Amino acid sequence: MQGTDNAPPGAQANKSSSPRRIRHVRRHYTSNDHRHTPSTAESNPVQRIRSGEECTVELSMSPGQPLVEEQPLVEERPPVEEQPLVEEQPLVEEQPLVEEQPLVEEQPLVEGQPLVEEQPLVEGQPPVEGQPLVEEQPLVEGQPLVEGQPLVEGQPLVEGQPLVGGQPLVGGQPLVEGQPLVEGQPPVKVQPLVEGQPLGNMVSLYDQLPRGSILSLQKGLTLAGVTTPVDMPPLAGVILLCAVLPLASVIPPASATPFAAVIPPAAVIPLPGFLPLGRLLHLADLLLRAGVLLLAGILPLAGAPPLAGVPPLAVALPLAGAPPLAGVPPLAGAPPLAGALPRAGVLRRAGVLRRAGVLRRAGVLRRAGVLRRAGVLRRAGVLRRAGVLRRAGVLRRAGVLRRADVLRRADVVLLAGVQQLADVQRLADVQRLADVQRLADVQRLADVQRLVCVTPLSVVSPLAAVIPAVAVIPVVAVIRVAAVIMLEKMQPQGSSPQLQMGCRRIRQRRSSPRTCQKLRQERDRAGISWREHVGRHMLCSSTRSRYCSHRLGAACRSHCRLRCGVLCLPHALTQPTRQERGVAEMMSTS
């Protein structure tokens, strides 16, 4: 089969003038086993498409090949060259560097955050994150840096001494630890103290003190119970008093001078109420300037707690212009101050040193990882502190538990003691019951003896023939028969229901004094005489079942107490209490 190549010319002209059109390729199956071989013009449909003519390509497909109908060509896709380039995207190289940011452990890097290089690094002090450096603050070894504390002009840099704002520096005045610097006051020449020199020869020190302070001091020492020799000045007494009294657990007042921080006034004079505080502080200042504190090298003040940040007196800075004391070692690593530095020199030297290398050193060390090390140390300290607190809490809980265990053990011991006492009490009660039983048996034998003695001969004579049989009868049976015979003769004709009700109450519960009074009133209403009452109780103790259910012993004894306050005949041999004897006397007289 061939395509339609011989089309009319008009139709070809119309189709050639129209835009390029591509007809879909039609394919169909042929029944022949061979494929159709087209001519050269037919075999190149691309040339026909370029020439503008319409062509239809018919291809023969073999059996079993899938049919793909109307598949368009992909020539209408625009070329990839028309895609714009991504040259307009800004480069990341223009992003500012974050080198100025300090390396803080666990802190994210924020873009644009400046590096804080103004914080000085003090040896032995952990750096604090985010704390700015104050240029006016001196660098003191071992002293924490307080943010915002200015450097006061004229203040000397003393190792370990806190900086107080507004304190002037006087040129030429020696720097004494703990001594306030007063502007315009000349330094006091101090007489050196030689070991072994008597204190009474210190006339110059005695003359330097004002007369009023000496008299007040002498009066205070006298009232405090400290007596000084006549030829010894009061200043020597103060020195001896400072050497003898321990200076411990004394808190100086907030408004006290630096002398009060070294030796509190309460330690110099035991009774500070005898001297005004202002005069006492003034006297302390004078004693400091006179060189009393230099005695610390000869007579150490035992027990004095050192002030926070202030070295002890034994290693104090030597005074300028005064020979060092014997036995006082100089401060290790601190040159003696020949004189006070001028104000301008102090400020210039401090500022130059601080600005020259502190900032660079701080930045280099911080970048090298000081803050990371500080964070590790801080975290280790927190863990140690948490462990100590946890261990302390566990110990406290363990102490509480141990204390609770001790209390429980004490309770158990007390309960055991009470139990033992109760057991002893029961044993004593059993012993008393046994004793009462023996006494009751003896009493019965005595009663039988009396009955035998008072029996008429007419009654005894018929029994003379049966004496062997009577001897065989048990003694207990004879006692019971005799008691029943005797008590039935004494028993009244009828029994009172009120008396029976009272006995029933006694069986049911323990009676109080109020119940005892009610029972006495019932006995009085029933009209029972004292003899009948005793007879009834004898019957109760002998038969054990007629008037009460109590057995013979302590129960019957308590029954007799509650009933009338007097023991019945079986218990007559026991020792009654004082109250029972009083009630018995009262009942016998009535």
Swiss-Prot record:
- The annotated region (8 X 6 AA approximate tandem repeats of P-L-A-[GV]-[AV]-[PL]) lies at 300-347
Q: Which UniProt keywords apply?
A: Repeat
- Signal peptide segment: none
sequence-type repeats, residues: 66-71, 72-77, 78-83, 84-89, 90-95, 96-101, 102-107, 108-113, 114-119, 120-125, 126-131, 132-137, 138-143, 144-149, 150-155, 156-161, 162-167, 168-173, 174-179, 180-185, 300-305, 306-311, 312-317, 318-323, 324-329, 330-335, 336-341, 342-347, 348-353, 354-359, 360-365, 366-371, 372-377, 378-383, 384-389, 390-395, 396-401, 402-407, 408-413, 419-424, 425-430, 431-436, 437-442, 443-448, 449-454
Region (11 X 6 AA tandem repeats of approximate R-R-A-[GD]-V-[LV]) spans which residues?
A: 348-413
Asked whether the UniProt record includes Lipid metabolism among its keywords, one would answer no
* Residue ranges, annotated region (20 X 6 AA tandem repeats of P-[LP]-V-[EG]-[EG]-[QR]): 66-185
Q: What is this protein called?
A: Ovarian abundant message protein
Q: What is the lineage of its organism?
A: Eukaryota, Metazoa, Ecdysozoa, Nematoda, Chromadorea
